[in-house]
Amino acid sequence: ASDVYKRQASESPAPGGGSISVYMGALGAALGTMVANLSSHKRGWDERWEEFSDWAEKGKAFQIQLMKLVDEDTDSFNKIMDAFSLPKKTEEEKAIRKQAVQEATRFATEVPFKTMQLCYECMSVAKAMAEIGNPNSVTDAGVGALAARAGVVGAFLNVKINASGLDDKAY
């Protein structure tokens, strides 16, 4: 966590808000998973071990999918920057550059859209753990849901700003 914190405070534009939105979703999934794991080992709940283990596996799957998107989001930003750095002296270069910018922008819109979907879906783990999990960990489940929600909202902002650069407005 301290490495992420230090990198975010640097002068580099990436990873930025998109990657942090993904990371927030992953943290939300991690908290839901933690509550599921704690609940599976709660004294007196031995017969519910499998139920909570299933929720923990769902949460872990969301974490893995989201963490893959952290790097994908940074890559999408870098592709846009690379496209904008292409030469634009001749008409042919301008056309190639414009197409590259549009393709990179489309990709940079798809990544946060996937982030929105996964962050929203991972809230199901936090919700279930708030309802059926260890009552001593209900606040952890709540913070997990809030983190995942922040991921959804942050990703939405990135979809909105990235989509504004697309010529194909129907996309």
Residue map of PLM features:
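Short, small-residue-biased leader/transition segments that mark boundaries at the very start
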Residues: 1-5
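Glycine/charged-rich beta-loop-alpha catalytic/anionic-binding loops adjacent to active sites
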Residues: 6-8, 12, 129-132
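Transmembrane signal-anchor/signal-peptide helices with a preference for the extracytoplasmic
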Residues: 34-46
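A structural-propensity feature for long, helix-poor, extended segments
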Residues: 43-85
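Long amphipathic all-alpha helical oligomerization modules
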Residues: 153-171
